[in-house]
């Protein structure tokens, strides 16, 4: 009886263990608080737009919805040039939502950004659409591939 009791307690405690991971290719990756997103090159936001897309390391005005792309957005319409900067990541979350029930779902991560030098920076959203039974959360590695050499991450320790 005592062994059964200990086994049940062990299973309960194991169920409380976090799935958080340091592996950037894992869907369970957790952004350490205090991490930063570093912009290495200027990003030009075109006239009459308030965002620029990045996919496969290239800035675009629109992107394929079936490959991971990141939308860097500002409050006011362009034209505007975003200068190289370091953004504090103040929040990081993973979501999914139906786009066309029951055929497609959007999987995305939202990074809330803060700049000491540039105003009007809105959260960056990185995601893609897929069939609900094929899709899975966006990984950190996929975000890094979408951003290419324009951005890099500095993870807090």
Where are these regions (language model features)?
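Bacterial signal peptide processing site
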Residues: 17-20
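Short, conserved beta-turn/loop elements at beta-strand boundaries and strand-helix junctions
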Residues: 91-100
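Post-signal-peptide N-terminal segment of Sec-exported extracytoplasmic proteins
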Residues: 35-64
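N-terminal post-signal-peptidase region of extra-cytosolic proteins
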Residues: 65-77
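Bacterial N-terminal signal peptides
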Residues: 5-14
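Extracytoplasmic
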Residues: 32-34, 82-86, 106-108
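Short coil-to-beta-strand transition motifs
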Residues: 75-90
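C-terminal partner/receptor-binding element of secreted or periplasmic proteins
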Residues: 117-157
């Amino acid at each position: 009886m005592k062994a059964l009791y200990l086994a049940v307690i062990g299973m309960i405690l194991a169920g409380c263990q976090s799935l958080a991971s340091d592996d950037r290719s894992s869907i369970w990756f957790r952004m350490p608080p205090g991490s930063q997103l570093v912009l290495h090159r200027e990003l030009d936001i075109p006239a009459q737009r308030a965002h620029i897309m990045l996919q496969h390391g290239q800035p675009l005005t629109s992107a394929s919805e079936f490959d991971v792309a990141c939308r860097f957005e500002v409050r006011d319409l362009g034209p505007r040039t975003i200068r190289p900067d370091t953004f504090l990541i103040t929040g990081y979350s993973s979501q999914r939502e139906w786009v066309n029930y029951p055929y497609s779902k959007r999987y995305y991560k939202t990074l809330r950004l803060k700049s000491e030098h540039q105003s009007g920076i809105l959260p960056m959203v990185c995601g893609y659409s897929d069939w609900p039974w094929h899709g899975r959360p966006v990984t950190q590695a996929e975000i890094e591939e979408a951003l290419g050499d324009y951005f890099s991450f500095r993870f807090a320790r």
